[in-house]
Amino acid sequence: MKGQIMKEYKFTASTIYKLNEKLKKKPFKYIYKELMPNFLFDKIQREVYFSNQKAIVSDWDKILADYFKDKIEIAKVIPKKKFLNDEKIIWQFWGQGWDYENLPNVVKICYRAMNKYRENYTLIRLDMENIGEYLEFPDYVMKKLSEKKMGYAHFTDILRFSLLKYYGGVWIDATILLTDYLPSEYFKMDYFLFQRDGDFKNKKEFELYDSIYFSWNKKSKIKMLSSIIFSHKDNKIMATLLDLLLVFWRDNDKIPNYFFMQILYTELVEKYYKKDRCKIVSDTLPHELFKVWFETYSKEKLKKITDSVSIHKLSFKIDSSKKKVENTFFEYFKNLYEI
């Protein structure tokens, strides 16, 4: 289009972040990390983390400024299927394939719970073998994935926003556990995802639980959970996130921060799409169950959690062999779903 430019948008880590990474390695780490009091080291790491987020915000803002002036040529994802306009679809992805016996136990639990609570929604489980039936990605996306410059986690960002833009429905990570049917109110919204609630009371509890993801510090720009997203077809926030991730991966071979997409979302809804932002429901809610996953099972505690939310973000990355499993919430769900 007229006025569009071919320009590279490179992301760079902050100077403080680069220095910090150097100091954490030999030979400096013996002085920097080992001899420094833990509280001081942790405080420095938080400030470095915020500094790097600030640098990422600056890089995203450069792209956003050109994007909203229609100055960027963007590669397209091509949809391959057609669905009925009123068809409600649940999308899931597991790159290694859905052979049940090969799934991690946590994913097996979520798999069976999804089958139980899918209701009358069309459930489409994707893997690397069948995504081509639904979407055609730009060559550079698949090339960077095959060369392992892009990991599955960040390829999944492109996949989820492509599916939601072109088909709509609800994206649900393979590690999302349902304990009831999906709330119908979320399907009625133009889009919905869980976000950071500034009025949440037990902030310290969650910052101690996961200091990388959870923070209510004003410097933090990571404020959304992408593991479950409801969206109507052609939602402009989903479309914009997809466009800008395609620009990022066109010009970059590595991520500046694991949550760089979440930082982009914050910039979009706080600066460009304020009126279009979905209502804020605390992203602590889907984490409540996994926070106690390896604790002693309590029927009362489970009821309290599931009364407040039916959508739970789990993880298969924690080595359960190193955790107490007997009589835990984990064991309860394993037994419930006969795993």
Where are each of the predicted segments found?
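Small-residue hinge/turn detector
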Residues: D157-Y167
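Active-site acidic Asp-centered loop
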Residues: Y167, I172-D173
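Glycosyltransferase-associated regions of secretory-pathway enzymes
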Residues: K2-T156, A174-I339
